[in-house]
Amino acid sequence: MASPQNTSQKRFFQANSPGGMPTASQSQRSRILAQITLRFLAIAFTVTAIPVMITAKEPVSLLGLAITPSYKQSSAMKFLLGVNATVFAFTALSMLFVWPLRRSGSKPINYFFLHLHDMVMTLLLISGCAAATAVGYLSQYGQPETYWSPICDIVKKFCHQMLISTVLSYLAFFCYLALNILSVHKLMSRATE
């Protein structure tokens, strides 16, 4: 027997029919729409972050030497670029697998594999973002203890573009975090049915 609190929690996440009663098809449609929207946003954020990072260059002359900083000079930035490309490709592929889930007879194992995919993409994104954030912090503030000087006061445009690319990657991460929450909710609701 379901408790009143349990029933109200289920209703909170379900859409209601015109008569006020929740329907499975409306709830299913809203979940699929949320999945597609979040995946589309993740694609948009990652595909935008890639060219922003690739085009980040600012030639500067230091002590008579011409230097052009680029993402290629930082393994963390190359890693983030690779992560963004990977997440973009796998998210585009995952859109093909979300569409069949709209049927009410979908097997729970399909949701599990999609959730597993979402977890791997989330972990990739947060690791790439963390690496880029560490390098960005050192570029902005330096580390006096090890005599690393900040460079962002010299190459402001380059640092600004790297920041934009990293922020876009973080936005893709938050999309995947929301996808994970949706997946867990779906798996939990199926387990209690």
Swiss-Prot record:
Bilayer topology annotation: Multi-pass membrane protein
Q: Where is this region: Disordered?
A: 1-25
Q: Which residues lie on this side of the membrane: Cytoplasmic?
A: 1-35, 100-118, 183-193
Tell me one Pfam family matched here: CASP_dom
Q: Where in the cell is it found?
A: Cell membrane
- Transmembrane ranges, per UniProt, are 36-56, 79-99, 119-139, 162-182
Q: Tell me which GO cellular component terms the UniProt record holds.
A: plasma membrane
Tell me which domain of life the UniProt entry assigns to the organism this sequence originates from.
Answer: Eukaryota
Q: State the NCBIfam families in the record.
A: A_tha_TIGR01569 (TIGR01569)
Similarity-based family: Belongs to the Casparian strip membrane proteins (CASP) family.
Subunit relationships: Homodimer and heterodimers.
The protein in question is named CASP-like protein 1F3
